[in-house]
Amino acid sequence: MSLILKFMLLILLVSSHHVRSGSIVKFLPGFKGPLPFELETGYIGIGEEENVQFFYYFIKSDKNPQEDPLIIWLNGGPGCSCLSGLFFENGPLALKNKVYNGSVPSLVSTTYSWTKTANIIFLDQPVGSGFSYSKTPIERTSDTSEVKKIHEFLQKWLIKHPQFLSNPFYVVGDSYSGMIVPALVHEISKGNYICCNPPINLQGYVLGNPITHIEFEQNFRIPYAHGMSLISDELYESLKRICKGNYFSVDPSNKKCLKLVEEYHKCTDNINSHHTLIANCDDSNTQHISPDCYYYPYHLVECWANNESVREALHVDKGSIGEWIRDHRGIPYKSDIRSSIPYHMNNSINGYRSLIFSGDHDITMPFQATQAWIKSLNYSIIDDWRPWMIKGQIAGYTRTYSNKMTFATVKGGGHTAEYLPEESSIMFQRWISGQPL
């Protein structure tokens, strides 16, 4: 299709859709002075009636917004607000960790933002997470439904921002978004062949500690626990012999296996499954979380986002949501993608680049599980297992495959990039710029 025809189609799309304009945010409560980066917030309506209103934060690259990659960031959950990514993992701002005193929590600049080299759309999805809302009662959604909604969001967002149509585009996320991101890449790839959609310059995707096939992956928690000296050799050998590798969907008649799995849980239930070296404090109720807990900033972000001056600064629609919840697990949701491995296979066939990384202290999604499904894709190795370095020190290990997929561990990392944001940022910046890790 010629560029002129594409431009004409884009004009027709703009004229046939009512798309709300985003708002430029120059100041945020809690941050001293004007923001040192360009921030836009806004809503994109989804569906014919646009009852679903997806809220986004868009931050331009510090380097060269006109040419740097454009990425969309999706947090996991499902139901976790993208502010978790922006404030805790890869954004230019973070919350100052001090005891809440009733005033607006303070924000500080970070040194590890991925916006150093990329334009990032942080998206609250599914509807009900963060500031995204529905004009009608929220209906049950699903993995496949969200994939289509996010694709529609991107098409409409690019109608509003046609200057980014030519930028290299990547889909990025972690944890549960491991089910969404590969399917979204596949959906975008298909959509690019339809004449009446604005083409998206899709180049690849990035996933951190992704859930890919939970029934398969959770069986790697016991080998991981043994490798980390959390269970004894004797218990591990008995588990292997009696359970035969199936530890979490055990036949009720296999009483011996059930008993052994119970012993495993006695050894590990009081360990922080997202990072084995961090104290296991209760973060389930953020309103009563202890200031000594590593996750105390989760309370601070809820205090910040529930402040009326913050909502006004972000141009949140008044009355659109009640209490802002960082990780909203009450959203009606069906996990209808059992495994995202077939999507990884299709994306590899279509030639898209990918970076899959794992913090090596995560029990929830052990790095061995990720290595196993990558191996099942059956691509040859072109750069074998080796350390990747930062300032002369080993930051992790990496391996690259012939399908343009790079796997990397983050030494000392956990379930998300928040545990080692500096190292994760360097890894991302090297990969996105085409450099070897």
Swiss-Prot record:
Tagged with keyword Cytoplasm: no
Domain of life: Eukaryota
Keywords: Acyltransferase, Disulfide bond, Glycoprotein, Secreted, Signal, Transferase
Pfam family name, one: Peptidase_S10
Signal peptide bounds: 1-21
Protein name: Serine carboxypeptidase-like 9
Similarity annotation: Belongs to the peptidase S10 family.
Tissues in which the protein is found: Expressed in seedlings, leaves, flowers and siliques.
Catalytic activity annotation: 2 1-O-(trans-sinapoyl)-beta-D-glucose = 1,2-di-O-sinapoyl beta-D-glucose + D-glucose
Compartments it resides in: Secreted
Active site: 175, 362, 415
GO cellular component, one term: extracellular region
Sites where a glycan is attached: 101, 307, 346, 378
Source organism per UniProt: Arabidopsis thaliana (Mouse-ear cress)
Disulphides: 243-257, 281-293
EC numbers, comma separated: 2.3.1.103
Disruption phenotype: Decreased levels of 1,2-disinapoyl-glucose due to a partial redundancy with SCPL8 and SCPL13.
Matching InterPro entries: AB_hydrolase_fold, Peptidase_S10
Job of this protein: Catalyzes the formation of 1,2-bis-O-sinapoyl beta-D-glucoside and an unidentified compound 1.
Gene3D superfamilies from the UniProt entry: alpha/beta hydrolase
